[in-house]
Amino acid sequence: MTTESTSTVTAKIPAPATPYQGDIARYWNNEARPVNLRLGDVDGLYHHHYGIGAVDHAALGDPADSEYEKKLIAELHRLESAQAEFLMDHLGPIGSDDTLVDAGCGRGGSMVMAHRRFGCKVEGVTLSASQADFGNARARELRIEDHVRSRVCNMLDTPFDKGSIAASWNNESTMYVDLHDLFAEHSRFLEVGGRYVTITGCWNPRYGQPSKWVSQINAHFECNIHSRREYLRAMADNRLVPHTIVDLTPDTLPYWELRATSSLVTGIEKAFIESYRDGSFQYVLIAADRV
């Protein structure tokens, strides 16, 4: 893959492998939504995924209170961090000498959480130079840059050695790639017995085809949401054997219903809520072992 020099913190940025990758890089380089940044400001963990769990209405208090919006933002952030913790619960036994990979790492919040939890190295890949620079700057602020690193990289063609990674994950980033290509790459760099975990939204084959709500989500994020069936088929074709599948749809709906009442709405909340309610869209965790 060809590279080009830049003057940013990231010394060399691989050129996009396809025009679509260039589109996605531009999308996330320009993204600065308050719903991501203001939530991250709560405790310095900047996420690019959604939340799970019951809303703590006692912590929110009275909507008429002048501090209510601040409390709502903190509650949304708590639910997003709970989602990341739930993903990490499924990574298996991880030692301090291991290396993990976050494929589609965003601004790096989950990477920081993984290092704090396991004491290991965490490598993140993203198409966005601005995200990588943000994540690396945050790691330096926390003085964990020797253990947590983001890089601009095509997640379908990573620099990691074959069999060198103990566990890896995609957290809401699989809808930007071909699943067979993605799982072939995870299978390549994971050690035998290594763990792969994804949390993702997928359209429900029982609905028949992607609903109008799913189509709206695709258009909003410039992505291509896959069906649940496609995940399982592509994993099986690439020596990743699923052993845990958790339907998180009921657990994420309260997050969306709360977010829809905040000042941070982006206009896509209704599509998520309606598609979860009508069964056309599902939010799932899948954990698989490399064999």
UniProtKB/Swiss-Prot annotation:
It comes from the Bacteria. It catalyses: (2E)-geranyl diphosphate + S-adenosyl-L-methionine = (E)-2-methylgeranyl diphosphate + S-adenosyl-L-homocysteine + H(+). Its EC number is 2.1.1.255. Gene3D superfamilies: Vaccinia Virus protein VP39 (3.40.50.150). GO terms for biological process: methylation; terpene metabolic process. Its cofactor is Mg(2+). It is an enzyme of class 2 (transferase). GO terms for molecular function: C-methyltransferase activity; magnesium ion binding; S-adenosyl-L-methionine binding; S-adenosylmethionine-dependent methyltransferase activity. InterPro entries: Erg6_SMT_methyltransf, GPPMT_Stmyces, SAM-dependent_MTases_sf. Keywords: Magnesium, Methyltransferase, S-adenosyl-L-methionine, Transferase. Pfam families: CMAS (PF02353). NCBIfam families: GPPMT_Stmyces. Catalyzes the SAM-dependent methylation of geranyl diphosphate (GPP) to yield (E)-2-methylgeranyl diphosphate (2-MeGPP). Belongs to the geranyl diphosphate 2-C-methyltransferase family. This is Geranyl diphosphate 2-C-methyltransferase.
